[in-house]
Design a protein with these regions (language model features):
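Helix N-cap motif at beta-to-alpha junctions
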Residues: 48-51
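Short, well-ordered beta-strand segments in beta-rich or mixed alpha/beta enzyme
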Residues: 42-46
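Long, contiguous binding/interaction regions
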Residues: 2-4, 8-41, 53-79
């Protein structure tokens, strides 16, 4: 089973990398890009057939390591 995990900063948390990209896009003439947010994307191959068990494992991975839940939020999908 494959897990796709997206981790982003929570709303209200300053994203300096996103701001830098937004300014760079503006300087390149892409003036219609605004509120750029940068995050992380991960794919994990899980050796698990049971979807409920895989979901529980991915949630634990996110809570314990993949996301800093104080400032980041995460979402995932299983395939």
């Amino acid at each position: 089973m494959k897990a796709k995990v997206h981790v982003t900063l929570k709303q209200g948390i300053l994203d300096p990398q996103g701001k830098a990209i937004e300014h760079a896009l503006d300087s390149l003439g892409f003036r219609n890009a605004a509120n750029v947010r940068v995050g992380k994307y991960m794919e994990l191959d899980l050796d698990e057939k049971d979807k409920a068990k895989a979901e529980a494992q991915v949630k634990q991975m996110c809570e314990k390591l993949l996301a800093n839940t104080i400032i980041e939020e995460y979402r995932y999908e299983l395939q």
